[in-house]
Amino acid sequence: MLSPIILFLSIIIDRIFGELPEKIHPTVWIGNIISFFEKILKSTHSKNKYKDFIFGTLTTISVLFIVFGAIYGVEILINNIQNIYIKYIVYSFLISTTIGYKSLLQFSKTPLNHIKNKDIESAKKSVQCIVSRNTDKLDTKHILSASIESASENITDSIIAPLFYAIFFGLEGAFIYRAINTMDAMLGYRNKKYEYYGKLPAILDDIANFIPSRISGILLVLFAPLYGGNIKKALNGFIKEGHKTPSPNSGYTMAVMANSLNMTLEKIGYYKLGNGEITLKKAYNSLFSIDVVIFSFIVLYSIYYVIFYYF
């Protein structure tokens, strides 16, 4: 299992420095690999759903094979480093490239800051960068809702899930998860072009996020008072509303957040979670919950690690 020191350093590195430039960012490279295979197989797309599924499966397997091979080779090189401190730093840096702590906070906070400054049009434009819905006609409460929904969902996708797989499967685990998540983001759409071509990435993403999403939700419940929430209401949201979103995973963190802070999160025509007025203060509190979840995750894992190895 991964040392808690590496986990902590990874978080600190990402929190301070944020995302790497696109030219040297591993996730961008993974995206380029996905685009390469999609371009090769694009001409083979047809109205035959079975063919589309087969070609999508070939793309998925190819991408995962390349990512695993590359990271396995990198890990061999890292293991040849004699200095343990340098080895820890390199390992931590690489894992930090699979998470998006700083960027998640920045993108989620921007719409809130615009609303605070009463600049609704800029808030609509900034929230459009983090959600797939049309934001042109959203009012203030639905802009706040969209920001919080995105932030709570991405606690899992951007942070907890890659760390979870790094803990149990090392660098390969973190990067394979990131590859699956990136393929789902690029190919996992329910439209004519991607319905079957992106089917496998979507299924794998649901499977990969099943445990991490529930860990994130449980941490939001347990430590609700630290971000101004209510444990009892948070637990009620987890149990009764976590399953109400189209995604089998994203609803748990959103439902906990909504109920814990006594507010309503709504994607019109899809779901409505919680019951209460959504305010700017509650929105900022929801972003603080990201810090709470991350550091509670690290602390609890550190305790488990010490008990497992030393007792």
Curated annotation (Swiss-Prot):
The protein's location, in the record's own words, is:
Cell membrane
Any matching Pfam family: CobD_Cbib
Listed transmembrane segments? 53-73, 76-96, 157-177, 288-308
Q: Which UniProt keywords apply?
A: Cell membrane, Cobalamin biosynthesis, Membrane, Transmembrane, Transmembrane helix
**Principal location listed in the UniProt entry:** membrane
Q: In which pathway does it act?
A: Cofactor biosynthesis; adenosylcobalamin biosynthesis
Task: For this entry, list what GO says about its biological process.
Answer: cobalamin biosynthetic process
Membrane topology for this entry? Multi-pass membrane protein
Q: Which molecular function term from Gene Ontology is one that the record holds?
A: threonine-phosphate decarboxylase activity
Sorted alphabetically, the Gene Ontology cellular component annotations on this record are: plasma membrane
- Family statement: Belongs to the CobD/CbiB family.
The free-text function statement in the UniProt record for this protein reads: Converts cobyric acid to cobinamide by the addition of aminopropanol on the F carboxylic group.
- The name of this protein is Probable cobalamin biosynthesis protein CobD
Q: Which organism is it from?
A: Methanococcus aeolicus (strain ATCC BAA-1280 / DSM 17508 / OCM 812 / Nankai-3)
Name the lineage.
Archaea, Methanobacteriati, Methanobacteriota, Methanomada group, Methanococci
Question: What gene, per UniProt, encodes this protein?
Answer: cobD
